[in-house]
Amino acid sequence: MSANDYYGGTAGEKSQYSRPSNPPPSSAHQNKTQERGYPPQQQQQYYQQQQQHPGYYNQQGYNQQGYNQQGYNQQGYNQQGYNQQGYNQQGHQQPVYVQQQPPQRGNEGCLAACLAALCICCTMDMLF
């Protein structure tokens, strides 16, 4: 797929911006969207606590940037953008056990024979 096909035009054409016909959303629309998140009263309490005690975490466990102490923001997603389900949180990691094989004996003879054969081959190659 070419860029012209993707963007729907030729390289020399410029699309004209048209101004939207509707005005921006009113404050009634903003009140509806605030119902989905934290209510404004809790946000006001949060900012009042931050002004009284700057630099400390408030009682709800959120720091100044709006992230809680565990690294997850208010919507339930961590800072990398993954949700909490299916990922281990810090402090709940499963231990990993590593087993080392005991050293095996009896291969030294074979290793010495291969090294001797390699030395003989290199010596013969240099002589002839």
UniProtKB/Swiss-Prot annotation:
Compositionally biased region (Low complexity): 37-106
UniProt PTM: Palmitoylated near the C-terminus.
Membrane topology, as annotated: Lipid-anchor
Q: List the disulfide bonds.
A: none
Q: What is its main location?
A: membrane
The stretch of residues making up the signal peptide is none
Cross-link Glycyl lysine isopeptide (Lys-Gly) (interchain with G-Cter in ubiquitin) mapped to chain: 32
Query: Which keywords does this Swiss-Prot/TrEMBL entry list?
Result: Acetylation, Cell membrane, Isopeptide bond, Lipoprotein, Membrane, Ubl conjugation
Source organism, top-level taxon: Eukaryota
Q: Where is this region: Disordered?
A: 1-106
Localisation: Cell membrane
What Gene Ontology terms describe where this protein resides (cellular component)? cellular bud membrane; mating projection membrane; plasma membrane
> PTM N-acetylserine: at which residues?
2
* Family label: Belongs to the CYSTM1 family.
Q: What else is known?
A: Present with 1760 molecules/cell in log phase SD medium.
Q: What protein does this entry describe?
A: Lipid-anchored plasma membrane protein CPP1
